[in-house]
A protein has these predicted regions:
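Conserved beta-strand signature within the Rossmann-like core of class I S-adenosyl-L-methionine
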Residues: 293-301
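Conserved SAM-binding loop
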Residues: 235-236
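A short acidic, Gly/Pro-enriched loop at the edge of an enzyme's catalytic core
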Residues: 256-265
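A short glycine-rich, Lys/Arg-flanked "PGG" loop and its adjoining helix->strand segment in the class I
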Residues: 280-292
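Conserved SAM-binding loop of SAM-dependent methyltransferases across substrates and taxa
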Residues: 207-218
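Feature captures hydrophobic
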Residues: 1-181, 187
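Conserved class I S-adenosyl-L-methionine
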Residues: 197-206
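Substrate-binding/catalytic lobe of Class I Rossmann-like enzymes that use SAM or dcSAM, i.e.
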Residues: 302-418
Length: 418
């Protein structure tokens, strides 16, 4: 079990069996902050008393119940990270957590208040932890293992049969998750204009869905690399079971160490694990690996340009507990990097943000439906609740377009760099 899931807050040593001075102090602050809510509508239950806040006419509403007053100390001392920790500990509940997070996103002033004051004292601690998780060659390996090597069995319980852990594309409202995953793979393959006999380099194997699908359905060859031990083992077996050893070459190599020359490269939601400081290195490596006129298809999760500079230096609960070392990209960051560090041209951009909200909703339903099986793998209730919050948090972010997901197509043109 990863030590990233040891829910720890500067208030964690306080007793949760009785009310404390801090609980009451932070409760007053919480109520005061929430009274600034302008968009959305909430009913908040505390100690049997109900507070009605926000816009009663809003179609976006939820009922929030504080189960134990230790919640107030956690959010007061840890901000929104503390709220996530409190949910993992079972200190609050809500009938619609997606609506709750959407309301908070729409009321940025309220979110900012929770992360200021005493809660800001936790920021240097979190940043210190985050700095120790830099995506060096050894650090990237450790960070990837912390997320993807929880166990293949864990992910098999709630991903679709393709074992694709990235946004699908739903052709219609009746499309299944598996169909959406395959549609996404086909979309990227079509962008690359793959023909039988072509060789594609894939940066980030996952569990092998792209490599095997491309080889089997399009008759091409794929060289694919991962630094996850569990994913490598799973993909190796998948390649063997599907008799694709002659078409798919599986590597366990960091992208920075890749060599060779390729006409076509693909990378699906791996760039989030690179770290913002390594984005120029990543794109330069891709540019160097591509032949002149070669194509690069990328699927990546983005953060709003306007808030990106603040975001990339912050540490949210996903960095702290779910995916150490992770950082989303921004569209302007990508374009700036292309201009300064590569011979790549952006040819096409497909916004699939709305599809990610549905993808996450399906994953969450599957995940919660397998709660008992997940527990039997050795994951405790804190872990399950924290991951539930992670899936909900992301779903709300995509609905509100606080974060996005795009498929990019780039072409290499020699001589662009001075």
């Amino acid at each position: 079990m990863s030590d990233n899931l040891n829910v720890k807050n500067i208030a964690s040593d306080l007793s949760i069996s009785k009310k404390s001075f801090l609980d009451n102090f932070f409760k007053k602050q919480f109520i005061k902050n929430m009274n600034n809510l302008e968009k959305g509508y909430m009913t908040i239950s505390i100690d049997g008393k109900e507070y009605f806040i926000g816009d009663k006419k809003s179609s976006l509403s939820c009922n929030f119940n504080v189960i134990h007053n230790s919640f107030f100390t956690l959010i007061g001392s840890g901000g929104l990270n503390g709220a996530a920790e409190a949910y993992a500990l079972g200190l609050w509940e809500c009938d619609d957590i997606v609506a709750l997070i959407r309301i908070l996103i729409q009321n940025q002033n309220v979110m900012n208040k929770f992360d200021s004051g005493i809660a800001s004292l936790a920021k240097p601690i979190n940043k210190s932890i985050h700095r120790r998780r830099k995506n060096t060659l050894s650090g990237s390996k450790k960070n990837i293992l912390a997320h993807y090597d929880l166990s293949n069995e864990f992910y098999q319980l709630w991903l679709d049969d393709t074992m694709t852990y990235s946004c699908g594309i739903f052709e219609n409202k009746n499309s299944t998750m598996k169909e959406a995953s395959i549609k996404k793979l086909d979309s990227l393959i079509n962008k690359l204009d793959v023909k039988p006999g072509d060789t594609i380099l894939e940066i980030g194997t996952g569990w092998g869905s792209f490599a095997c699908h491309a080889a089997k359905e399009y008759g091409c060859k794929v060289v694919t690399t991962t630094i996850s031990d569990s994913q490598y083992d799973y993909a190796k077996k998948k390649i063997s079971l599907e008799n694709l050893e002659g078409q798919v070459t599986l590597l366990k190599e960091d992208y920075r160490n890749l060599t060779g020359s390729y006409d076509k490269i693909v990378s699906i939601e791996m760039i989030e694990a690179v770290g913002h400081e390594n984005i120029p290195t990543y794109f330069k490596k891709v540019s160097d690996l591509l032949t002149n006129g070669g194509k690069f298809a990328l699927q990546g999760i983005t953060y709003n340009d306007q808030k990106f500079d603040t975001y990339k230096h912050s540490v949210d609960f996903i960095n702290k507990y779910i995916f150490p070392g992770a950082c989303l990209i921004s569209l302007s960051q990508v374009l700036d990097t292309l201009k300064k560090d590569t011979n790549l041209i952006l040819n096409d951009l497909l916004d699939i943000t709305s599809h990610y909200a549905k993808t996450l909703n399906i994953w969450r339903e599957n995940f919660l439906g397998k709660r008992d099986e997940i527990s039997s793998l050795g994951f405790d209730d804190n872990f399950i609740r924290l991951w539930e919050f992670y899936l909900v948090y992301c779903e709300a972010g995509f609905i509100e377009q606080n974060i996005g997901d795009y498929q990019f197509l780039f072409t290499k043109k020699e001589g662009l760099l001075p």
